[in-house]
Amino acid sequence: MLPSFLSARTGPVVLPRVAGVAALAMGLLGFLASCSKDDETTAATPSKITVPQRALSPEGIQYDETNKRFIVSSRTQGRIGTVRDDSTYTQLADDPRLVSTIGLNLDASRQRLLAAVSDIGVNTTRSTATTLRKLAALAIFNPSSGALTSYVDLGALRPALPHFANDIAVDAQGNAYITDSLSPIIYKVDAAGVATVFLENSQLSGGTGFGLNGIVYHPDGYLLTAKTSDGTLYKVPLATPTAFAAVTSSQSLVGADGLLLLDNNTLLVVAGSQNTVFRMASTDAWTTTRSSGSFATGAVSATTITRRNGSDAFVLYPYTATSPRFAITKVVF
């Protein structure tokens, strides 16, 4: 199509020099503005990204604002990869010790990507009798190169217990807190890589099911963590973890998985077995909470959720362990 400042007539058009230049400039501005609008439309954030990766079964997700990409884990293959808005998947990191990568935490200010490593038997290539339901580890990577910089064995702290390292929170000092879904434990790995048992209490047990799952750090100095089996949400003070308490809630959070602290008073909870993302609100520093909204995911085995562009939230749909695809979907309440 011809720009509007060019005539479609067959004969020559003679314009005064000044008028001609002005018309040319106006036409170019209009043309460039049109291009700019097209570019903005192209760059718009998609509401859903479907990724054609067979049997990847991603469990954890983070959004890398600096590089404009999602980072996902894999229960069935162990490797960590990135996803662009055009659905392109690229492997970022892998190591033979990564039987199943579960929760992720992108600690951007310290240039670290933290991954919880476990073995529940779904990676048939790497699972062994010595790791099955016994492996709990924290792997730390350079998020730019994918290089593994540290691997911390957490299960060795309680070798007689079953283990499943699940999710990770990082506090303001760089300490990492990792939930164990098969034992009633929260581990702590300090910035120097030293691992300890931060909290161990039978109340945190999931019995024959999954116990603690999602975990987030609250800037007022405590952790919020959810138990999958019964949906209990716990508040755990960093200074006195044994003084942890259940958060009183009128909303059932049974099946609670990933958490996202959207702001100090708003927590998003992915309840996979309920096919729902709940928006929970608190006005008393998480002594109590109530639901202020929900988002229906459908039967997609939703696991966890991440922040993008400050306030947007995207939930991960792994579907099944053998699915030919997975999806990342914007949550709208």
Task: State each model region's role.
Residues 45-52, 88-94, 147-158, 195-207, ...:
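A short beta-strand motif characteristic of beta-propeller blades
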Residues 83-88, 142-147, 189-194, 237-242, ...:
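Short loop/turn segments that connect beta-strands within beta-propeller blades
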